Every structure is written in structure tokens, then in C-alpha cells.
Amino acid sequence: TVALQRAQMTRAILLRMIRMAELRDPKETGPHVNRVAGYSVEIYERWAKNNKLERKEIDRTRDNLRMAAMLHDVGKVAISDMILKKPGRFTDEEYGIMKSHTWQGARLFINKQSEFDELAQQVAISHHENWDGTGYPGHVDIESGKPLKTGPNGEPLGRKGEEIPLFGRIVSIADVYDALVSQRVYKDAWTEDDALEEMRKMAGTKFDPELIEVFFQVLPNIRTISDKYKSDL
């Protein structure tokens, strides 16, 4: 059918977008985005069941969330190689540019035509927000990155609590956990015990405490996904 062909074409384009991000940023590997997507779906499914959502809605959202989570860092295609591939610490200016990957990614979905576009935009812009309002980019205009609300220092005011879209809060947990337990050029992988202790510690500050409880409920599934998509490092 035409609808099926269109869906397959959309999926193919999205997979190419994911590949583009991977070519630009050495950290955005295939295994990493697959793990983040897998963890996100597990957290969402358990949260949805806990909250008695209908199976039909869960299935539809799950498929959209998987692709949106894979594209969480797609805005990095707008960041220069000098910053993306810098081995040392960022200067304040470089960090400011790096943070723009959130709204730059959200801009790709600005003419929202589907539930997927809405979800992908939410994930791109909000996966670095913190539950306590200390994350980024905060309340900014998606087109320009300019602040819509500013804090006392003139910086954009961070989104906090349930101002952060649910799917951004979920992908944040998946992304941070994967970063902790993964080896990178500049750091060794943490042990699972240390990473889990850190995740628990950040409930209520970095993360939504309810979703951290859900994360621990699905830990066996998280381990299975982690084993399935091992990194080459």
C-alpha cells in the first residue's frame, strides 16, 4: 500500500539521518544509539503499564520513541568538527556552541506533520534538561536558540520537573546511563554497581524520581539490551 511505502521511505530517511550524526560524532556510534533507544523503550513501556495506558497507544508510541531516541543527538551535524572531536575540555564558548545541538536538532522537525515529528522534536530539545532546572538549553526559541525566559544571570531559564517533556526525561536517563557504563577515549567504563549508585543519587536532581524507579524495575531488560548492542571499543 501507499501508506506502507511512505512509512518505509520515512524510516529509510531517518536511518540515514542517524548515520549522518554517527559520521560526524565518533561517540554517536550505532551500538550507542541502539542501546539508548532500547533502554528508552523499556522505561516507557513499564511507565505506561504502571500508569494503565492502553496497549494500542503504548505500541504506537513505542515505535515512534525508538526512532526519536536514536535521533536524540542529530543536532550535532550542525556542530563543527573542531568542537565535536576535541579531546580535551571545552572552553565556555565551545561548551555554549556544543549545547546548541539540542535546539539545532529540534529545528529539523519544525514543520511537524506527525506524532513522530512532535516526539523527535521533544527528545532533541529536552534530553539535557535536569529535573531541578539546572540543565540546558532551557526555554529557548527553536528557530534561533534565543532565550524565551531568562534567569538572573541572563542565561535561558532551564525547564524543570514536568515542564520537561516525558520523552526527554526518559531519554536523558537512558543516555546518561549508557555514557557512564561505556568506555570513551577520555574515560574508562564505570562498573554497573557504581553507575547504578550514581543514577540513584541523581534522582530528584538530574532525573525524574518516578522514572528512576521505573529504570530500576526494568534493569534485567536493560542488561539484555546492553549485551545485544556491544560497542567495538
What is each model feature region?
Residues 2-13:
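Amphipathic coiled-coil signal-transmission "stalk" helices
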Residues 19-233:
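Metal-dependent catalytic cores of enzymes that make or break cyclic nucleotides
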